[in-house]
Amino acid sequence: RKHRRSVMNRRTFIKASLTATAAVAGSVLLDGALSSASAVTVPNTTEDAKMKILVLTGSPRKNGNSNTLAEHFINGAKEAGHEVTRFDAASSKVHPCIACNKCGMNGPCMFKDDFEVVREHIIPADLVAFATPMYYFGISAQLKTVIDRFYAINGEIHIPKKAVLMMTYANNSPRNESPILTYYEVLLEYLGWKDAGRIIVPGVWPTGAINQTPFPAQAFALGKSV
């Protein structure tokens, strides 16, 4: 029975993956009408609810613009009384998934590395926040490596959670946001998570450029309001 469940989970995963690939491939053909001006939030329906939050950062630049967003988000969440853990994918040792399937989508991974920290905190987390720069129209390789390893804990995180996306990129074309936004949306749909807010920041490239914008304050407000 356990083997049969694993096979069915894998089929569901593959089906969702194919849907995501098709969606991302198609999204770059559309003219973007996506807003980059503000954070979109879903108010917390439970007054004074305190959450466990895991923030996954993916910028290899220590003082990168997406890291700045993450830091302000964390400060806002802590001020609201939430318990926050940050995992920096860029400075951690996480081996890429090699599709060996030894984990069976719900078991120990063959690689014993820093992903164990993610496993420890993401399973009980009420909200998972992703912070990444756009690299070649996708999320950073460092963050993608961590997300790929979700495969080994699929059965434990395929439960209702909230999620937040914070993304920065250098140009000013909303159309270029589409691949990452589509990826994020399909990921949440597959996992059964609910979007709690997004902060998408165009036109920032040099380190520190985001400090001259209103977006760090928006990240703080989002962290405080989730």
Identify the function of each model-found stretch.
Residues 51-54, 164-165, 199-206:
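A short small-residue
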Residues 158-197:
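Short, glycine-/small-residue-rich phosphate/pyrophosphate-handling segment
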Residues 83-87, 193-201:
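Short beta-strand elements in bilobed, periplasmic/extracellular small-molecule ligand-binding domains
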Residues 92-93, 171, 204-205:
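Short, internal active-site loops enriched in acidic
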Residues 17, 21-131, 137-153, 208-209, ...:
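N-terminal beta1-alpha1-beta2 submodule of the flavodoxin-like/Rossmannoid cofactor-binding fold
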Residues 1-7, 46-48:
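Short, Lys/Arg-enriched N-terminal segments with co-localized hydrophobic residues
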Residues 6-21:
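N-terminal secretory signal peptides and thylakoid transit peptides that target proteins
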Residues 58, 89, 167-170, 201:
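Cofactor-binding loop segments of dinucleotide-utilizing enzymes, especially the Rossmann-like FAD-
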